[in-house]
Design a protein with these regions (language model features):
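Conserved phosphate- and dinucleotide-binding cores of soluble alpha/beta proteins
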Residues: 44-152
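N-terminal active-site beta-alpha-beta segment that forms phosphate/nucleotide-binding
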Residues: 1-79
Length: 152
């Protein structure tokens, strides 16, 4: 239908990080015929990520942070992503997010369309997280208890 995303972006969780795994989401999206993009740390522009296409047969290797990423793949324009699954160590009901502190997701999400959702345990929802001017707000937090839409 017209409400189904045509292209999703999902992180590949860093082993031992406590991030919620995205494997089941990726497999279900692939089986539904939805295109999938995953992030790759850019080796040309420090502090930036780019997106590449992914399917279940895509070979992965750990990057310098230990995060699995494809060796290669079709470059995907971030402006084409309909739904972003963003990693979070914590989030507030305001839509503020705590990541790993390097700003990679804030940079790639800045100005990008698409619905931005974090996957995290309910216990990692916080009352308040201060926002910096460069921080990008989430549109939703998805926990084992349900979906939380931020208040503004």
């Amino acid at each position: 239908t017209d409400r189904c995303p045509r292209l999703i972006q999902a992180y590949l969780e860093q082993p031992g990080s406590g991030e919620i795994g995205t494997g089941p989401i990726l497999r279900a999206a692939f089986e539904a015929g939805i295109r999938i993009a995953v992030p790759v740390v850019d080796t040309v522009e420090p502090g930036r990520m780019r997106l590449v296409g992914w399917d279940p047969d895509t070979p992965l290797r750990p990057n310098r942070f230990g995060i699995p990423e494809p060796d290669s793949g079709e470059d995907i324009d971030r402006m084409d992503v309909d739904l972003w699954f963003v990693p979070a160590l914590g989030a507030a009901r305001s839509g503020a997010r705590i990541g790993h502190g390097a700003g990679y997701y804030d940079r790639i999400l800045a100005g990008a369309p698409g619905f931005k959702a974090a996957l995290l345990p309910q216990a990692c929802l916080l009352d308040h997280i201060p926002l910096e001017p460069h921080d990008v707000r989430l549109d939703a937090m998805v926990t084992e208890s349900g979906v939380i839409l931020p208040y503004l």
